Amino acid sequence: MEVLKWVVTIVVLLFVAIFAFGFLSGDPSRNPGRGSGQ
């Protein structure tokens, strides 16, 4: 069942990457007053 494990790992990594990318890209848009990044 290595294929299933690989598929799950890839899906999780893609989901985390998309979530992180969307969060970083939408962080200043969501919190224009705070600006915790910079």
From Swiss-Prot:
Biological process (GO), any one: photosynthesis
Keyword Transmembrane helix recorded: yes
Localisation: Cell inner membrane
Keywords: Cell inner membrane, Cell membrane, Membrane, Photosynthesis, Photosystem II, Reaction center, Transmembrane, Transmembrane helix
Function: One of the components of the core complex of photosystem II (PSII), required for its stability and/or assembly. PSII is a light-driven water:plastoquinone oxidoreductase that uses light energy to abstract electrons from H(2)O, generating O(2) and a proton gradient subsequently used for ATP formation. It consists of a core antenna complex that captures photons, and an electron transfer chain that converts photonic excitation into a charge separation.
Statement: the UniProt record of this protein carries the keyword Zinc-finger: no
Gene Ontology cellular component annotations, sorted alphabetically: photosystem II reaction center; plasma membrane
Major localization class: membrane
Biological source species: Gloeobacter violaceus (strain ATCC 29082 / PCC 7421)
Pfam family, one: PsbI
Subunit organization: PSII is composed of 1 copy each of membrane proteins PsbA, PsbB, PsbC, PsbD, PsbE, PsbF, PsbH, PsbI, PsbJ, PsbK, PsbL, PsbM, PsbT, PsbX, Psb30/Ycf12, peripheral proteins PsbO, CyanoQ (PsbQ), PsbU, PsbV and a large number of cofactors. It forms dimeric complexes.
This protein's name: Photosystem II reaction center protein I
Lineage per the UniProt record: Bacteria, Bacillati, Cyanobacteriota, Cyanophyceae, Gloeobacterales
Membrane topology label: Single-pass membrane protein
Domain of life: Bacteria
Similarity remark: Belongs to the PsbI family.
Transmembrane segments: 6-26
